[in-house]
Amino acid sequence: ASGSQGPVAQAPVALVFCAVPSRSAARYGAKGEQLFCIQDATIACAYAQLAATALGLTSVWIGAVHEPEVVQEALRLDDGLWPVCFLAIGHPAESPERTTRRRLSDLVHELPR
């Protein structure tokens, strides 16, 4: 359901972040149903990934749920819950070498005054 993503099957913990489109639609209309609920789920996943890293764990974000109906059925999700992304979490199998961080000037662009 995650498109042959082995980390989900191998990880000791796999979290599924879901949206509730109807709840967002009730408050924000079509944008809530089609966009805001997905943004909320992905933001929650990003914070969970940061928390895992802070605990010394490693994680893999899988941001495409190719067969949401299969996930809904397999996890017995309530109607209205829409799986948006997965986060596989575990202890690192190895300690990879740290990569060089990009310079702030490569990431931030100032607007002219």
State what each model feature region is.
Residues 1-113:
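Acidic, surface-exposed loops and disordered segments
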